[in-house]
Amino acid sequence: MRAKIVAGNWKMNKNSEETEDLINELIDKLPTNSNAKIIIAPTFINLASAVDHTEFTNIRVAAQNMHQAENGAYTGEISADMLKSIGVNTVILGHSERRAIFHETDAIISFKVDTALRHEMTVIFCFGEELKDRQNKQHFNIVENQLRDGLFHIDKSAWANIILAYEPVWAIGTGETASPEQAQEMHEFIRETVRKVFGSDIAEDVSILYGGSVKPDNAKEIFSKPDVDGGLIGGAALKADDFVVIVNGI
């Protein structure tokens, strides 16, 4: 049975003191017997502290990004080995903001995936279409292409370390809203696309998270869909009470 997962992407928020406070609040309020795997992704400078504070809890810590190279003259970058050395074994790759703001291509993201898997890290692989793609009815093609370019070259065995996170970019901060039915439609398509290439076992085992503005008031309905295995949460992950409601909705 595939894992249910709720991952909180904190983005560029929370200084060191605020990070510690939020983690302590989550430890106090999150259920210890949750059906969901719980992941938080603080900023780079707070990862080591987060790992220490969550050591004896059911909360796992992830990085928001990493560089594809092992080391070298890449000012401002962080490598997989550096993350592993402080106990971070999970990384978010291909996030829509990395693609749009920092111009990360499918090729760059694919290299990052390869590096992370080489270091036996778990990859939360993000992908999804923009508003113009959906308006032009190209959304299925875009999603399939991103999956193919980013993941379809990896070995079957590597899928044990892959979590998929579908981000409908057109429904994030645009005023547009993706319905639970639209989420299910795309998640079903994603699972069938994986099935065609890698078979039913991998397709049924891989967790597919929804990353389209999940909030306390819509989480339970979205998570009730058969191919939605949890969420990649943005703004709502920065408030402990909101995040707890979302986790309880799984």
Curated annotation (Swiss-Prot):
Compartmental location: Cytoplasm
EC number(s) given by UniProt: 5.3.1.1
Pfam families assigned to the protein according to its UniProt record, in alphabetical order: TIM
Main location: cytoplasm
GO biological process: gluconeogenesis; glyceraldehyde-3-phosphate biosynthetic process; glycerol catabolic process; glycolytic process
Keywords annotated in UniProt: Cytoplasm, Gluconeogenesis, Glycolysis, Isomerase
UniProt pathway annotation: Carbohydrate biosynthesis; gluconeogenesis; Carbohydrate degradation; glycolysis; D-glyceraldehyde 3-phosphate from glycerone phosphate: step 1/1
Active-site residues per Swiss-Prot or TrEMBL entry: 95, 167
Catalytic activity: D-glyceraldehyde 3-phosphate = dihydroxyacetone phosphate
Domain of life: Bacteria
Record: residues binding substrate: 9-11, 173, 213, 234-235
Enzyme class label: isomerase
GO CC annotations, alphabetized: cytosol
Family per record: Belongs to the triosephosphate isomerase family.
Entry function: Involved in the gluconeogenesis. Catalyzes stereospecifically the conversion of dihydroxyacetone phosphate (DHAP) to D-glyceraldehyde-3-phosphate (G3P).
Subunit structure: Homodimer.
PANTHER family: TRIOSEPHOSPHATE ISOMERASE (PTHR21139:SF42)
Protein name: Triosephosphate isomerase
